[in-house]
């Protein structure tokens, strides 16, 4: 590669390894700032602790009889355009060899090791040469098998290494992510498979057969909800401790916490907030009644490229209308399915009226043909009116009165009856979930396509949650009422509004979390996935659509 012109930073040598292994993986990690641990990467971090603790320095002047044994040596070269932290440099005088540690066992292949590892080691040797040392070879040390494999820096390997540097630099400058590997055995073991979505992207681009079920299990912990106004949350080692009036009432391990949600006047100490930011655990702030007020994250996702695509496409009226149509069609379809599945009645009224289902089907057709966002908004409103007019028929007792619940129409700000109070709270929680999911993949939750940007309103979160309102929020309300978890005595009425009591809110949150953890079969990809993981997958698919990698955004519609 020619000498860098300042348009891209120096390429980390470890990224050359990823590029030779999979160009898309290197692009995701280096250009877009994506990363996710799995058992293999965590094990690698543990096994690297000794060499990473070095901070070694090479002698500025070499002597013939001087021995060199330095760990964790950092070197860079503007001419080569690369930088590296070498695990170990050993040698004597001007003749040195880099040693790179690998977590696994030695592979019995030609050359003693796979090409990505040999290229990475050779790049380290080239850096040593740039700094005045002679380096004709190095070694790979495989920790699991405790074997050392020598690697000679011959002309062929040097040529391949220089070509890899040039290829990666050009790829980074292109601004186009390389396509996913095709049906590769590398994908299932990759820690970024749930971010890359190789099979899903190829399937949606009509390039391959149905995706393999390679979505990793949820391993990011669970949300921590703190709703007591007297709660005081502090850090104690690797835990968040919740106290009330200096009495320890609960604790949560930071490593098992995916996000923190604070209601009302609950207090989070500065030290605890700093630790959440360091670990990239988002903190959301809600009013006492559950209204979403704000979101605290660390420095934010480094994927500027994704947000650039988002902002560019959000100013395109055709893109906005196309996405909005599909969101509303999916929402109406899921509302229709919820009515059909949960309708309660006897005799001739045991099933949802065909006329109602047909009207909702017509609403879907009209929404797909809406000529403008304003017309689409009217169609959505009319369809929502039909849906909520019959919402009580899904409540136990037919009209909801058997459980003491009466619902006739949707109202809010403030909700005036128990069912509306539950719906508003569920929608606020779903908004928070989508805000967290969108920020986690590099999108701006506040720049929408259907919902217009307004101060403090997470417009894109509101866009994306439309198809999930009936599937997650409304379903949680139905289950809470029909299963007897929430009763009419669990509400406080004041100032013309209706709100949940503290104990009832805690039970409802538990029900919402159960729904988020429930697994469902994806109608397009055919694998099972939890609703929580599904939100992230859908958010990542939106980024793939906005970048032009897939032709259309695939909404989630149940049958």
Curated annotation (Swiss-Prot):
UniProt-listed GO biological process terms: CRISPR-cas system; defense response to virus; maintenance of CRISPR repeat elements
GO molecular function: 4 iron, 4 sulfur cluster binding; DNA binding; endonuclease activity; exonuclease activity; metal ion binding
Cofactor(s) for this UniProt protein: [4Fe-4S] cluster; Mg(2+); Mn(2+)
Region (CRISPR-associated endonuclease Cas1): 224-559
CC cofactor note: Binds 1 [4Fe-4S] cluster per subunit.
Keywords: 4Fe-4S, Antiviral defense, DNA-binding, Endonuclease, Exonuclease, Hydrolase, Iron, Iron-sulfur, Magnesium, Manganese, Metal-binding, Nuclease
Keyword Signal: no
Binding site for Mn(2+) 1: 87, 100
Binding site for [4Fe-4S] cluster: 22, 187, 190, 196
InterPro entries membership: Cas1, CRISPR-assoc_Cas1, CRISPR-assoc_Cas1_C, CRISPR-assoc_Cas1_N, CRISPR-assoc_prot_Cas4, Dna2/Cas4_DUF83, PDDEXK-like_dom_sf
Region of interest (CRISPR-associated exonuclease Cas4), residue spans: 1-198
Annotated EC: 3.1.-.-, 3.1.12.1
Residues that bind Mn(2+) 2: 380, 451, 466
Catalytic reaction(s) noted: exonucleolytic cleavage in the 5'- to 3'-direction to yield nucleoside 3'-phosphates
Assembly description: Homodimer, forms a heterotetramer with a Cas2 homodimer.
Annotated family: In the N-terminal section; belongs to the CRISPR-associated exonuclease Cas4 family.
Described function: CRISPR (clustered regularly interspaced short palindromic repeat), is an adaptive immune system that provides protection against mobile genetic elements (viruses, transposable elements and conjugative plasmids). CRISPR clusters contain spacers, sequences complementary to antecedent mobile elements, and target invading nucleic acids. CRISPR clusters are transcribed and processed into CRISPR RNA (crRNA). The Cas4 region acts as a ssDNA exonuclease, while the Cas1 region acts as a dsDNA endonuclease. Involved in the integration of spacer DNA into the CRISPR cassette.
Protein name: CRISPR-associated exonuclease Cas4/endonuclease Cas1 fusion
Organism: Geobacter sulfurreducens (strain ATCC 51573 / DSM 12127 / PCA)
